[in-house]
Design a protein with these regions (language model features):
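A compositional/biophysical signature of low hydrophobicity enriched in polar/charged and small residues
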Residues: 1-159
Length: 159
């Protein structure tokens, strides 16, 4: 978990710019934040050390790599004991098709975002990995027809 630190407007500008443009140079980042490059780099490193910046990633077009199927799976478990929840999360982390895993409150225990090349690929994953997994009691799926919005990170205000 990220260490709580007080962010000023310069830190927020740096975070905003890096979240939108992860490859922005330190010089451009400093210019946008209104400071020189050396203190800007120190601030970026401090934000990384505090766990606020967790990494830098490329936004890859899944269709371009042949992943044309995106499915959301609502997974119910037989047991919600903490050890069983952790075991399921550990198992899910080994499946590259699962891009996101969220534990939910309510009738469903987990929501998984799964990508696949095609329906056969998804069905194979579903029947050979997800549904027979230990402690899984039921799985409901919903096919994503299209995505209207996919933003990473969080809204960053300047105040």
């Amino acid at each position: 978990m990220a260490e709580k630190i007080k962010l000023d407007s310069v830190d927020r500008q740096i975070l905003h710019d890096l979240q939108d443009h992860g490859r922005m140079t330190n010089v451009d980042l400093a210019r946008n934040a209104g400071i020189s490059a050396p203190p800007c780099l120190r601030r970026v490193r401090a934000l990384e050390d505090a766990g606020i910046i967790k990494g830098y990633h490329a936004d890859i077009d899944s269709d371009a790599l042949g992943y044309s199927v995106q499915v959301f799976a609502f997974v119910g478990l037989t047991s919600q004991a903490e050890i069983d929840l952790q075991d399921f999360e550990t198992l899910v982390s080994t499946w590259p098709q699962v891009r996101e895993c969220h534990m939910l409150m309510g009738e469903t225990d987990f929501l998984l975002k799964i990508v696949a090349h095609d329906w056969d690929d998804f069905q194979k994953f579903l029947t050979s990995h997800l549904t027979p997994a230990k402690n899984v009691s039921h799985v409901k799926t919903a096919l994503s027809i299209r995505s209207a919005k996919q933003l990473v990170g969080v809204p960053i205000s300047q105040t």
